[in-house]
Structures are given as structure tokens and as C-alpha cells.
Amino acid sequence: MKKITIAFDVDGTLIQTGATSEWDMIPNRRILRLLEALASFKNVTIVVWSGGGKEWADTAVKMLDIGHLVKATYSKNLKGRDESGAYIFEPDIKPDIAIDDIHACNLGFLNLIVNEK
């Protein structure tokens, strides 16, 4: 059985964009339901990552009470932007599926872009 790793982004994906602390995080319930459903599959591993760093991903997992569903958290290692303005990330892992709000992302082998904006 092939294991599938699915990475969920924090800002603009699991929570609405604009939070500056754990106290103003507004959950995106639709995406959280998706995470919960995918976590129920035997061969799926859920990870959460953020361009804001591993600590921000850890905070989101705690505040959203999804720690029991998440195997690990990571930083997406934001390095800056390229000449077109697109974000440059150098994450430590390449998941099978990356679920994100950034349209110009190529973070996973398959990239699903949420429609939250």
C-alpha cells in the first residue's frame, strides 16, 4: 500500500488570511472538514506547513485542535520572491499533494489550490 502525504498550508487555507496571533485565527471550516476526511484514510499522512514557519504551523494545529490528525508540522522555508513576484519556497519535504491558496505554487507532486479568496 503506497503511503500518500498531504500537506495543508495554514494562512488562506486552514485559516483565513490576516491572522497575526492565535487569538485572531478564523478557521476555514470547509478545508478543516476536508483534512478530517482525508486523515481517515489508512494510507494518508497529514502534515501542516506554513510560509510563516514551523512555529506558526504548530500554533495553528493547536488552536484548530487538529493535533490528533496531523503527523508533523513544517516550515515552507520562504526565501523571497522571484522577478515576477511569485513566492520562492524551499520546503524540507515534497508531499504527494499540497493544498494551498497560492496559485503559482508547485510545492507537491500534485497541487490543489483552494478557492477561499
Show the residue positions of the predicted features.
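Alpha-helical substrate-recognition element adjacent to the catalytic core
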Residues: M1-K79
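C-terminal cap/substrate-recognition subdomain and adjoining C-terminal extension
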Residues: K54-K117
